[in-house]
Amino acid sequence: LRAEGEQKKARDWVEVDSIQEAVSFLSSVSGVIFATTGSKELEALCQIPDYQKRVYARVLPTSNVLKKCEKLGITGSHLIAMQGPFSTEMNTLFLRQTKAEWLLTKDSGRAGGFQEKVEAARENGTRVVVIRRPEEDGISLEEAMEVLKKADEGNVGELKTHLILAGIGMGQP
């Protein structure tokens, strides 16, 4: 059971379905790229022409990740190893420091700091490439409330689904 959120603002970024589509798009344009997609996507980013000059990667500061980055040739000032979450201000600083013309991110939702990244890009005039979340089977908030109401009333026999509450995010401070 997943209640799908509503998109509140019109999207003003480039959307792609996969890291490969992002690489293809970013290979067709010029400019520095600030990548916040994580270490699992780094190999694909190495397909971008001049990636060692164009790509700045923000990754988790673990020894395995740092070794992987070194092996791929993403080192020195092009490697930012820090643990989030990051505020809009912090993201803005990274974009300015790297002189990024492109922000590459996943649609990670509230818990992944997606809004802070997009706001920082807007403030900085940085264009954004977003890797969409895979389509998932979900229900509306109203449908989820109805399922919960039936379960609360003891009408579990009427339910044709299992109800699991998991991964509800970090919440607002």
List each model region and its residues.
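N-terminal phosphate-binding or glycine-rich loops at protein starts, especially the Walker A/P-loop
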Residues: 161-173
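Short, ordered loop/turn segments at secondary-structure junctions
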Residues: 1-6, 108, 133-136
